[in-house]
Amino acid sequence: MNARVYRVLPAVFTLVLLACASATANDPLLLDSRELVKEFGSALQSELKHGLTEGGPVAAISVCKDKAPQIASQLSRRSGAKVRRTSLRHRNPANAPEPWEAEVLRQFGLPSSTTDSTAPPEYFSKADDGSARYMAVIRTGPVCLACHGDSLAPEIAAKIDADYPHDRARGY
């Protein structure tokens, strides 16, 4: 009889976990968070494409430096959420992760670069007061490696060195 109980219990735990995951997947705060990340990514990608077209990778550095914080600020004001970028290997010390963010980033396995087709890792946690925390990975694509890769063109390295003297966001 004990053997039968042991076979049933894992199935019950799996069903309970799946039910919880389903409830979380439909949480309005999670859905809103995903939408904000999507909006941020689309706006930043559009600005980067424009910068690359107008002035190449050196101009794109200014997009990440100036436009990305503006986009995050606009989304923050509109939504009431705190929208920002962070990394364990940040370029700007102002973007250093808070302790909880650093822990989530370590759980994600960052700062590894992943460009496979699986869904990027995300984190969602809801507090008792109704607030929530959400993080999602920004994938490092081939165009990103011009400024974040192992080998940078001299003019790109010089611009990054001038704009970010404490840069830690290379070598992906």
Can you name each region flagged by the protein language model?
Residues 3, 23-24:
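Intrinsic disorder/low-complexity signature
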Residues 24-143, 155-172:
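Extracytoplasmic c-type cytochrome modules immediately beyond a signal peptide or single-pass transmembrane anchor
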Residues 1-12:
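Bacterial N-terminal signal peptides that target proteins for export
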Residues 145-152:
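Detector for the c-type heme attachment site
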Residues 12-13, 49:
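Exposed boundary/loop context
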